[in-house]
Curated annotation (Swiss-Prot):
Gene Ontology BP annotations: cytoplasmic translation; response to anoxia; ribosome biogenesis
Lineage: Eukaryota, Viridiplantae, Streptophyta, Embryophyta, Tracheophyta
Gene3D superfamilies: 3.30.70.1730, 3.90.105.20
Family: Belongs to the universal ribosomal protein uL10 family.
Pfam families according to UniProt: Ribosomal_60s, Ribosomal_L10, RL10P_insert
PTM field: Phosphorylated.
Subunit structure: P0 forms a pentameric complex by interaction with dimers of P1 and P2.
Function: Ribosomal protein P0 is the functional equivalent of E.coli protein L10.
GO cellular component: cytosolic large ribosomal subunit
Designated name of the protein: Large ribosomal subunit protein uL10
Keyword terms of this UniProt record: Phosphoprotein, Ribonucleoprotein, Ribosomal protein
Transmembrane segments: none
GO molecular function annotation: large ribosomal subunit rRNA binding; protein-containing complex binding; structural constituent of ribosome
Taxonomy, superkingdom: Eukaryota
Gene name as annotated: RP-P0
Species, as recorded: Zea mays (Maize)
Length: 319
């Protein structure tokens, strides 16, 4: 017969387990566990087995363990987790890809009926169509102001009806009607609310960003920095190339307007004095490209023509 452990022994064992997880893992998903059953949680643990560990427990106990761990080891990188322990939450320690782990957890959501008193996590809309209920049960629909008609001896809903809005409590009439229609409008599972990695905490929406999104946002940021730097004449890595170009343009403009000159400026001055020289340069370049195209046309002309059917000994009127 197994010896039953005392509360103190259970706390010591829990503290030891949490400290070992803090030593081993650097990535943690904080997940809300409202309305998640023990069987569902067991399935999630089984699905994540290998590179992830799900740890549930009282928030006060987890906070105390993290605080003691930081004092003993001097490692305070997990301190941000303490502020995230609000409500019925659990910790998912992982060595795998955070996005993949979140997607794996989402697979274990299960449908649930709308029980009386529950706060609706989503809007509940009853679709139009035949309900399969006999006319004697129209009172449920009348109480909720749902337009119906009798069609072939059964009640039919005419238009879509928003029965419950997100954030509202489920009433007895709504619960009874949804049960009769066989609608399970809610789904429950571990819902990732925050992500921790190497001392940083961020929203789970960040996991949906692709590499292309990051590159685009980075490029936008660089462009904004360059624009601001140019506007206030403050040199930054993003703005320096543009500053050099603008500076060169200014020097060139000064050289054109004064007697000061240098080789590149001489060429510009020459074009400004005699624009025809610039016009002559363009046809020369075009002529070079035309000359290169001529041999290709000759080669094409030299290709033998395909033999016709008659030349090959065939005729349309051959038997």
């Amino acid at each position: 017969m197994a010896i039953k452990r005392t509360k103190a022994e259970k706390k010591i064992a829990y503290d030891k387990k949490l400290c070992s997880l803090l030593d081993e893992y650097t990535k943690v998903l904080i997940a809300l566990a409202d309305n998640v059953g023990s069987k569902q949680l067991q399935d999630i643990r089984r699905g994540l087995r290998g590179d992830s560990v799900v740890l549930m427990g009282k928030n006060t106990l987890i906070r105390r363990c993290i605080k003691v761990y930081a004092e003993k080891t001097g490692n305070h990188t997990f301190d941000p987790l303490m502020d995230l322990l609000v409500g019925n939450v659990g910790l998912i320690f992982t060595k795998g890809d955070l996005k993949e782990v979140r997607e794996e957890v989402a697979k274990y959501k299960v449908g649930a009926p709308a029980r009386v008193g529950l706060v609706a996590p989503v809007d509940v809309v009853v679709p139009p169509g035949n309900t399969g209920l006999d006319p004697s049960q129209t009172s449920f629909f009348q109480v909720l102001n749902i337009p119906t008609k009798i069609n072939k001896g059964t009640v039919e809903i005419i238009t879509p009806v928003e029965l419950i809005k997100k954030g509202e409590k489920v009433g007895s009439s709504e619960s009874a009607l949804l049960a009769k229609l066989g609608i399970r409008p809610f789904s429950y599972g571990l819902q990732v609310t925050s992500v921790y990695e190497d001392g940083s905490v961020f929203s789970p929406e960040v996991l949906d960003l692709s590499e292309e999104d990051l590159i685009e946002k980075f490029a936008t940021g660089v462009s904004m920095v360059a624009s601001l730097s140019l506007a206030i004449s403050y040199p930054t890595l993003a703005a320096v190339p543009h500053m050099f170009i603008n500076g060169y343009k200014n020097v060139l403009a000064v050289a054109v307007e004064t007697d000061y000159s240098y080789p590149h400026a001489d060429k510009i001055k020459e074009y400004l004095k005699d624009p025809s020289k610039f016009a002559v340069a363009a046809p020369v370049a075009a002529g070079d490209s035309g000359a290169s195209a001529a041999p290709k046309e000759e080669e094409k002309a030299a290709e033998p023509e395909e033999e016709s059917d008659e030349e090959m000994g065939f005729s349309l009127f051959d038997d």
